């Protein structure tokens, strides 16, 4: 089976007919070789010889060598592949420049290598490692530069505020300041009104007490103000003149009551002053009394001592 496969592979890599002997023809003046063309021709000859040796070894071993894991195997060449290899040579170099054996080898047994296999072999040898690093480094640098540019743009956008937005913000700040000032003034007014309410409540309490005292005085004199008020409520006055007279009389009575109350208050204040003076006098008298008692006790002691001296 191995020999049959080898023969089948050889038939795949052969061309249609055997090579023919070509006459040696001189190069025309237009087909002179440049240095890079001679290097390309030498490289094609080297590839052809290496391919022939590889095919011989694979035929002796009984088949193709299995490629390593991760490397794609090169596909067997066909008639089209052999033509592509021949076309890969430089056009300026004629076919008569090479020997017949090398041309037949190149056209018959040169396998076309896939791009993936060449790239993997080149990577395995370590040829593209610096190139890859050279390519990745600028990409990373470009990525970092772009990120920095985007960040700077975002910061600029966030910091920049157009005039149309700044004006309403300033207006809002001014309005807030005015509202704070108004709130402070309102708090002050509230505190003042609360103090005034306390004062008014105290005054109302005093007036109620004064009213109670007045009613008590009227009752003591034989006037029932409560009954009179109830009767006046039950029997409403028909004539406005009577009501006016009653009001005038009430006003006169109130005036008199106020005058009497003022007089009594003055008398009370005078009595209070007298009481204070009498209290002061009493305190002074008590002090003098204590001093007299102390002096009397001292005199008694002195007299007793004198009596004792006389008896001696």
Swiss-Prot record:
Start-end of Basic and acidic residues biased regions: 1-13, 131-143, 166-176
Keywords tagged on the record: Cell cycle, Cell division, Centromere, Chromosome, Coiled coil, Cytoplasm, Cytoskeleton, Kinetochore, Microtubule, Mitosis, Nucleus
Coiled-coil ranges per UniProt: 169-210, 246-288
Entry keyword annotation includes Nucleus: yes
Domain of life: Eukaryota
GO cellular component: centriolar satellite; cytoplasm; kinetochore; microtubule organizing center; microtubule plus-end; mitotic spindle; nucleus; plasma membrane
Extent of Polar residues compositional bias: 75-84
Molecular function in Gene Ontology: microtubule plus-end binding; protein homodimerization activity
Signal sequence region: none
Cross-referenced InterPro entries: SKAP
Location(s) in or outside the cell: Nucleus; Chromosome, Centromere, Kinetochore; Cytoplasm, Cytoskeleton, Spindle pole; Cytoplasm, Cytoskeleton, Microtubule organizing center
Ranges for region Interaction with SPAG5: 156-312
Region (Disordered): 1-32, 55-176, 221-242
GO biological process: cell division; cell migration; cellular response to epidermal growth factor stimulus; chromosome segregation; microtubule cytoskeleton organization; mitotic sister chromatid segregation; regulation of attachment of spindle microtubules to kinetochore; spindle organization
PANTHER family the record matches: SMALL KINETOCHORE-ASSOCIATED PROTEIN
Subunit-structure text: Part of an astrin (SPAG5)-kinastrin (SKAP) complex containing KNSTRN, SPAG5, PLK1, DYNLL1 and SGO2. Interacts with SPAG5. Directly binds to microtubules, although at relatively low affinity. Interacts with CENPE; this interaction greatly favors microtubule-binding. Interacts with DSN1/MIS13; leading to localization to kinetochores. Interacts with MAPRE1/EB1; leading to localization to the microtubule plus ends. Interacts with PRPF19. Interacts with DYNLL1. Interacts with MAP4.
Domains as described in the record: The coiled coil regions mediate binding to kinetochores.
Reported function: Essential component of the mitotic spindle required for faithful chromosome segregation and progression into anaphase. Promotes the metaphase-to-anaphase transition and is required for chromosome alignment, normal timing of sister chromatid segregation, and maintenance of spindle pole architecture. The astrin (SPAG5)-kinastrin (SKAP) complex promotes stable microtubule-kinetochore attachments.
Listed name of the protein: Small kinetochore-associated protein
